[in-house]
Amino acid sequence: MNMQEVYEYLSTVLPEGHVKQDEMLKNHTHIKVGGKADVFVAPTNYDEIQEVIKYANKYNIPVTFLGNGSNVIIKDGGIRGITVSLIHITGVTVTGTTIVAQCGAAIIDVSRIALEHNLTGLEFACGIPGSVGGALYMNAGAYGGEISYVLTEAVVMTGDGELRTLTKEAFEFGYRKSVFANNHYIILEARFELEEGVYEEIKAKMDDLTFKRESKQPLEYPSCGSVFKRPPNNFAGKLIQESGLQGKRIGGVEVSLKHAGFMVNVDNGTAQDYIDLIHFVQKTVEEKFGVKLEREVRIIGEDKE
């Protein structure tokens, strides 16, 4: 279908300024790479998301969903069809020890809201840069905590635009993975069950984790966080470091000198630079240690022609 027609129709469904053509997706990822989206939409509520899905299904238009772009590499050729950004779906409510957070809310912000209400259980998330939806998608975690420990249920939208509530068991959580990598559900909101705590103790733990993160991670450059999952009984960063790869650069992207598990965009790097460096690191580590590093970061989109 003609993308101009798609743009014109969706412009009648969403608020002014929330539908764009040929939007550069590097403006919507933490690592500042990514080509153009044919049509880019940023819904403000669930009804608008449903309208987009039903329209796309009617005309067989591919749809790609983005959170805040913290753990994704979008290829330099961009994304065909409709790209849906969920960054405006950000509501958070607190009732007793329960927090309900919508998909586009930053998980860091949710952890801070928990602190404000003297609730403990989300301290580990105080330095995770992703959205709530992204955190559920990959079962994000840090410093001994992970999303699956505090999630009780979530509201999702099916590929047909229907709303469903799923309990935690349906998520099939594992280490940095969930069922959402294999189905077409869109995570809309999450319900977290926390415990009452002491403000000063919660804040002290968050301050400690923030200090550790800032002292060990290369926050001065754009990055997608940990590139690889932790291999069994080992650490990706340790294997990369011992392979002599810190400082290895392809194009504008290099293996961080501060933390070998990170790849940073130091000089206008491209998605292809990232992909080539990832493959080089995987090949080198496997040749040296016999360990296959599995990507944690998602790669989506089309190659540049």
UniProtKB/Swiss-Prot annotation:
Annotated GO biological process: cell division; cell wall organization; peptidoglycan biosynthetic process; regulation of cell shape
Domain called FAD-binding PCMH-type: residue spans? 33-197
Question: What are the UniProt keywords, alphabetically?
Answer: Cell cycle, Cell division, Cell shape, Cell wall biogenesis/degradation, Cytoplasm, FAD, Flavoprotein, NADP, Oxidoreductase, Peptidoglycan synthesis
GO molecular function terms here? FAD binding; UDP-N-acetylmuramate dehydrogenase activity
Keyword Cytoplasm on entry? yes
Which function does this protein serve? Cell wall formation.
Similarity remark: Belongs to the MurB family.
Which reaction(s) does its UniProt entry say it catalyses? UDP-N-acetyl-alpha-D-muramate + NADP(+) = UDP-N-acetyl-3-O-(1-carboxyvinyl)-alpha-D-glucosamine + NADPH + H(+)
Cofactor requirements of the protein: FAD
Q: Would the keyword Nucleotide-binding be found if you checked this record's keyword annotation? A: no
Instruction: Identify which residues the record assigns to the active site.
Output: R176, S226, E296
- HAMAP family named in the record: MurB (MF_00037)
Q: Kindly list the GO CC terms recorded for this protein.
A: cytosol
Entry's transmembrane regions: none
Q: What's the main place this protein lives?
A: cytoplasm
Pathway listed for it is: Cell wall biogenesis; peptidoglycan biosynthesis
EC number(s) reported in the record? 1.3.1.98
This protein is called UDP-N-acetylenolpyruvoylglucosamine reductase 2
Q: What class of enzyme is it?
A: oxidoreductase
* Location(s), subcellular: Cytoplasm
InterPro entries, per the entry: FAD-bd_PCMH, FAD-bd_PCMH-like_sf, FAD-bd_PCMH_sub1, FAD-bd_PCMH_sub2, MurB, MurB_C, MurB_C_sf, Oxid_FAD_bind_N
PROSITE patterns attached here? FAD_PCMH
